[in-house]
Amino acid sequence: MMSTELFWTRVGVYNETMWPLVMAMTVAAALLTYRVFFTPGARTDLWMKAFLSFAFAWNGIVFFLVSVRNPISTFTGVPLFILVSLLFAVDIRAKKTHFQLPEAAWKKGLTVFWIALVFLYPLVGWPLGHVYPRTLLPMFPCPLTVFAIALVAAAVPNVDRRIFVLLLPWALMALPKCFGALDCYEDCILFASGVYGLVELVRNWRARRVAAREELPVQREIAG
């Protein structure tokens, strides 16, 4: 297990080294979020999937394998992030996921809430004593996962469920952070988003089962 001091030292080095790309990714995420909210469609889907594919690959390889390497990131984070990256890339052609704000007002509000928290990650960490460069910026692996969960949960039922499922383990594994692991309490946001994502995934799964049961008698009646 990586020590708390070593973790935050490596975060600081990563920020000081990679800040131009980290800032560019944050701006790109903000602009693409605007498109999802106000101009959803095929072009927005394409650009968002391409961005997410790159962001997950970058974090999986550069952040986990090079900058903040430890057993958990190497053997759990890397495979999960690379798989998610590949699935977003594949979905550019498959077109299973369509990003947009949900119709229900409560769910729309939650989507905005989660994405706002992503961009507020550094501010959440500030009163906890995490100031730049030793702070988690919006497109770090954990806030990026929150960002993706919010987007795919909003897209339900028009979503590749494999992506949805693969996003959840990394989020739910953040529970120890809520009890002081690595002095990274801001990742309680990540854990909470994982719980939210799991609830939405189960709700969608149940809704699909109910719809399938209701459709079966109709099909039998037509066939008969």
Ranges and model annotations:
Residues 1-69:
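N-terminal topogenic module of multi-pass integral membrane proteins
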Residues 20-33, 79-95, 143-155, 189-206:
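Hydrophobic cores of alpha-helical transmembrane segments in multi-pass inner/ER membrane proteins
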Residues 41-53, 102-111, 156-167:
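Membrane-interfacial loop-to-transmembrane alpha-helix junctions, especially the N-terminal start
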Residues 54-62, 113-124, 168-180:
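Aromatic-anchored segments of alpha-helical transmembrane domains
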Residues 66-69, 153-165, 171-187:
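Membrane-helix boundary connector in multi-pass membrane proteins
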Residues 74-148:
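Membrane-proximal helix-loop-helix units in multi-pass membrane proteins
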